[in-house]
Amino acid sequence: MKVEKIGLLGFGTVGSGVYHILTKKQMSIEKKTGVSLQIEKALVKEPELFADKISGITFTSDVDYILNDEEISIIVEVLGGVDFAYNCVKKALESGKHVVTANKDLLAKHGVELSQIARENNVYLYYEASVGGGIPVLRPLVEHVSSNEVEAIYGIVNGTTNFILTSMSQQGLSYEEVLKTAQENGFAEADPTSDVEGYDATYKLIILTRLAFGTNVSFDAIPKKGITEVTKTDLQLAKLSGYTIKLLASVVANGEEVYLEVRPYCVSLNHLLAQVAYENNAISVTGDALGEILLYGKGAGSHPTATSVVADVMMIATQQNRNAKVVPFEPLTEATKVHTTTAPLKDYAVVIETSKPEEFDGVVLPNQAVLTRFTQISEAELEEKVFAYQQVDGVETVRIYPVLEA
């Protein structure tokens, strides 16, 4: 049986998950691919901690010892970070090695360049795990949705924020209370900034947009707002109005343009995304012929993410064994849409905290707040109305949520 040797860069949560799947599912993988997948070497900071515990793998802290090994044909990068990972992946591709990575930050910043290097060296760069964790999202976009013109993508792509918002909604707790519990139980990092401010979701949105439209948008060019200002009052009012609040990463086509943003939305309870609870993720893709499809599952964690990584490795091995040439798993070489910073007309829900909510039109929480609605309005018009609300005596704060209907 043909053997494909793997160099594993990183042996943490995801890296160890890759090892365990390849070990436990060895016979099944060999039957499906016709290839024996063997981790030859693994990059770790302290090799001596692993040498006596795991046999059959050479652990090293010298990345060149792995990248210069001509017998290794596939590099799996699960290091995290950008600069060091970029240098490793770039060198691997230039050396004629296939690469599988779960590194969304790396791909958001350097994905176009790395994809070009992969093309020039006739190797594969696969990264299914970078956006949906265990959810197969990117390959369907490339292989199955490509015959459609994508009209919109809305995604719950961060498990931490979805866990927090679900807990706030179902338990009636504040953001601060739920965040503390999430950190204590390992659902949120000690420094949750990347998650709760929407940065993690923005990196994933960049990758989705690149694959769906061929449009490369920088991180700084995307409007982003996290969940730190969402209150239990907002969630109560949303529920009374037939909605829930979700942090969505979205890209919407409008003619020849696409508009991207990451922010909390009021999502209709009749929409499939409203049913996505706790750490689960889901991505809604709407195509002109296909209509709307929903891809749903575990968005993070050792086994879901490692499963996607192994699936990419198996795909490469199968293609190599059968000498098959498939649709490249890469961005379009030419953009089909142009990025715009002007938001399209949208529906909005506006929460007004005031001691006199009855004086406003909308759904009221007595003596606390009111949720009022605007349909198909521009951001500029909405800002004028919000400014007017803020001048009214008794109004404390005003919060804005775009609306996603079913």
Segments predicted by a language model, with ranges:
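N-terminal glycine-/serine-/threonine-rich beta1-alpha1-beta2 phosphate-ribose binding loop
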Residues: M1-E94
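Rossmann-fold NAD(P)-binding glycine/threonine-rich loop
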Residues: A85-K91, K104-L141
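A short hydrophobic/small-residue beta-strand
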Residues: H98-V100
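Conserved anion/nucleotide-ligand pocket segment
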Residues: E143-L208
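Substrate-binding/catalytic subdomain of NAD(P)-dependent oxidoreductase enzymes
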Residues: L179-Q275, N280-A282
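ATP-dependent carboxylate/acyl-activation modules
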Residues: L273-P328, A335-T341
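A conserved regulatory-domain signal marking ACT and ACT-like small-molecule sensing domains
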Residues: V313-M315, Q319-A406
